[in-house]
């Protein structure tokens, strides 16, 4: 009996060659719509789908393959006489191979001018139905959803006259991943359209971006996946211009650096980062000087770190960075001369290009954190804050210079691991106290790191001071201005201590924990 294949694809890559090889092997080919036209024009003889169903395509192609003659031919178990007899009694011919890929729903909704009607029309119904039917009956039917699998299928058919069960099972699993991902994108789109923020079912889909050598440690297996609907400012969207593949830890650090730089759009800024904590942030009127400040903030910790810049890298800045061992440099662009400088004798230096300012982060954009057996979902911490809403709670008002420095410090401390403290002036970080289990310890670390540079310095805390001992330490160091959220039941004790030492202190009313 002649074997039959059903081919209906939106992605025509390689399909003519695939179909030609099937014909050489003696297969009949059923086809639909544009796929049939493509194959017929290439000289590949095909059978029209309506010749199989006895029913014309209708409703602009919405109904063409949803028919017992198709799904019966796919689902009939070859090992059950009753199934084969039912097919014979109803004049249903068996289908042994299905090659289908789906309407481009993802590509459609990514278009900036997409309409709701366009999105709906690009939801495939018949394609997923055929794929699922064929995949369910993978004991007998081969199903292909990815052109990358054409070669292995042809190789096995040529060698054995059929595919192996292992191949059919693997391809079936791929189909179910594919259709699940397809439906997840549709669900995500419709959920957003109706404004549902707390759906009872959360469906997320990600595409494999990069298999990794290992994870956080060498004994951990790992892979990097990109969101099904890519985010413009994500590390997953960066273009790598030089260097080795990014490691697991590289990606996490780079992500943290990109999050930080988004808050510093108004002036040229450089962020240096290690272990997901900023070790240096510099801001100036030009990117070269901003680099100088970021480097001077902590020339020890920057060694082996990640640097992200929010302006084009020029030759002068590149020369300075070239002299420092860095793992990664991220910037929106590089001059040709800068790129030549950075890559000279630095084949392993990872240089990334990312227009991360193309889109502001939105509070509505969810952030996911995995726990054992569960997933925490929250909005990103990108609330718009205005200094006009801040409250000076001490007797002394801050000077204009202090206000500028406090605004800078408040942006910077948001990305320090809690308990997070940062000491800055108006253009660079001076000391960072991250991740201590008590706040006064973080205060001491930040101050110790800033020693010798505390004249005119200010201090920011990501959360309130639970006790006045923090203010005591700050005053003892000679720092005269503090910014913190406030909100402790002992706020008054901290205010009184600040007044006692002539400090100025601002309450923002917004906490920025980062675990």
From Swiss-Prot:
Swiss-Prot/TrEMBL catalytic activity: (6R)-10-formyltetrahydrofolate + 5-amino-1-(5-phospho-beta-D-ribosyl)imidazole-4-carboxamide = 5-formamido-1-(5-phospho-D-ribosyl)imidazole-4-carboxamide + (6S)-5,6,7,8-tetrahydrofolate; IMP + H2O = 5-formamido-1-(5-phospho-D-ribosyl)imidazole-4-carboxamide
UniProt keywords, alphabetically: Hydrolase, Multifunctional enzyme, Purine biosynthesis, Transferase
Top-level taxon in the UniProt lineage: Bacteria
Keyword Hydrolase listed: yes
Annotated InterPro entries: AICAR_Tfase_dup_dom_sf, Cytidine_deaminase-like, MGS-like_dom, MGS-like_dom_sf, PurH-like
Pathway, per record: Purine metabolism; IMP biosynthesis via de novo pathway; 5-formamido-1-(5-phospho-D-ribosyl)imidazole-4-carboxamide from 5-amino-1-(5-phospho-D-ribosyl)imidazole-4-carboxamide (10-formyl THF route): step 1/1; Purine metabolism; IMP biosynthesis via de novo pathway; IMP from 5-formamido-1-(5-phospho-D-ribosyl)imidazole-4-carboxamide: step 1/1
EC numbers on record: 2.1.2.3, 3.5.4.10
GO BP terms: 'de novo' IMP biosynthetic process
Domain MGS-like: from-to ranges: 1-145
Molecular-function GO term, any one: IMP cyclohydrolase activity
A Pfam family the protein falls into: AICARFT_IMPCHas
Keyword Transferase: yes
One GO CC term on file: cytosol
HAMAP family: PurH (MF_00139)
Domain notes: The IMP cyclohydrolase activity resides in the N-terminal region.
Family: Belongs to the PurH family.
Protein name per its UniProtKB record: Bifunctional purine biosynthesis protein PurH
């Amino acid at each position: 009996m002649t074997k039959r294949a059903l081919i209906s694809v939106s992605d025509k890559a390689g399909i003519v060659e695939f179909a030609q090889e099937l014909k050489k092997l003696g297969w009949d080919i059923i086809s639909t719509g544009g796929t049939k036209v493509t194959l017929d024009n290439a000289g590949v003889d095909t059978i029209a789908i309506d010749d199989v169903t006895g029913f014309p395509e209708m409703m602009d192609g919405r109904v063409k393959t949803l028919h017992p003659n198709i799904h019966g031919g796919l689902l009939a178990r070859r090992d059950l006489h009753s199934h084969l007899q039912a097919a014979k009694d109803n004049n249903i011919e068996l289908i042994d191979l299905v090659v289908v890929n789906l309407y481009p729903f993802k590509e459609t909704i990514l278009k900036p001018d997409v309409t709701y009607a366009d999105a709906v029309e690009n939801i495939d119904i018949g394609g997923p139905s055929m794929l699922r039917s064929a995949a369910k009956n993978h004991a007998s039917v081969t199903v292909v959803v990815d052109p990358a699998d054409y070669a292995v299928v042809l190789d096995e058919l040529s060698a054995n006259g059929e595919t192996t069960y292992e191949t059919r099972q693997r391809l079936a699993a791929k189909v179910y991943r594919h259709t699940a991902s397809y439906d997840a994108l549709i669900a995500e789109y419709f959920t957003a359209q109706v404004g549902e923020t707390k759906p009872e079912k959360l469906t997320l889909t990600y595409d494999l971006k990069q298999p990794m050598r290992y994870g956080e440690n060498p004994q951990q297996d790992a892979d990097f996946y990109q969101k099904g609907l890519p985010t413009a400012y994500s590390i997953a969207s960066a273009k790598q211009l030089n260097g080795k593949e990014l490691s697991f830890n590289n990606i996490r650090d780079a992500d943290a650096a990109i999050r930080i730089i988004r808050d510093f759009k108004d002036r040229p800024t450089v962020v240096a980062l290690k272990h997901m904590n900023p070790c240096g942030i510099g801001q100036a009127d030009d990117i070269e000087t901003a680099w100088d400040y970021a480097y001077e903030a902590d020339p020890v910790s920057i060694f082996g770190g990640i640097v992200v810049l929010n302006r084009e890298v020029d030759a002068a800045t590149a020369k300075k960075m070239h002299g420092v061992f860095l793992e990664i440099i991220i910037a929106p662009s590089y001059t040709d001369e800068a790129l030549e400088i950075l890559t000279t004798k630095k084949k392993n230096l990872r240089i990334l290009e990312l227009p991360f300012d193309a889109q502001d982060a939105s509070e509505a954009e969810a952030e996911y954190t995995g726990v054992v057996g569960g997933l925490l979902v929250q909005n990103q911490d990108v609330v718009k804050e205005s200094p006009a809403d801040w409250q000076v709670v001490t007797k002394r008002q801050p000077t204009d210079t202090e206000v500028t420095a406090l605004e800078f410090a408040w942006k910077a401390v948001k990305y320090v691991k809690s308990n997070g403290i940062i000491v800055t002036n108006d253009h660079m970080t001076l000391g960072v106290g991250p991740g201590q289990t008590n706040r006064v310890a973080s205060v001491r670390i930040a101050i110790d790191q800033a020693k010798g540079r505390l004249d005119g310095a200010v201090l920011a805390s990501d959360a309130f001071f639970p006790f006045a001992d923090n203010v005591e330490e700050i005053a003892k160091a000679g720092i005269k201005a503090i910014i913190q959220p406030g909100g402790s039941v002992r706020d008054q004790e901290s205010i009184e201590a600040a007044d006692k030492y002539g400090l100025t202190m601002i309450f923002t009313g917004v906490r920025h924990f980062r675990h």
